[in-house]
Amino acid sequence: MKIGIDARLFNQKGVGRYTSNLIENLLEIDKNNNYVLFVRNEDFDQVKLKIKNLKLKIIGVDIPWHSIKEQFQFTEILDREKLDLVHFPYFSVPIRYNRPFVITIHDLILHHYPTGKASNLPLPSYAIKVLGYKYIIKKASGKAKRIIAVSKSTKEEIVDHLKIKSDKVVVTYEGADDKITNQESRIANDQRP
């Protein structure tokens, strides 16, 4: 299979760390499929150095997430690659994309707390952003072949709030970074770094 991964958040915190760890570990265990990573141009060289795999193609795309360009230009780029499947590790999916895809939903925090307190946008702009988020996450969830939820409670929220059938949502817990697990081992064995 030819599988695409939206890795535009590769060097960001949170979802970016999830994405980079997912890619590194997936490429380590999967020797059968071919992968295409879509990364920001500014991250291209770093991703190429960090991930060495013969079955990997890296494409630089300067398309910001949550943008109009994402909805139109990114769809065209994805279509050109004729992918069998795309994984969007974040809710921001080009809703015009009509080939098979999987989406990871980490939480539905904006459904519960759409206050704007965590944003530096003016309230009217933030309200539009929340409406866009709700529209895109609902559309993407409906079109996705599968939805990855990072916990049972997130799965329950997806089923309840987005009205998605339970069997479409798969719970896959996020793993801990090796740096953390190695640190915990040293602490447990009372060793100093």
Predicted features along the sequence, with ranges:
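Carbohydrate transferase catalytic cores enriched for Leloir-type hexosyltransferases
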Residues: 1-193
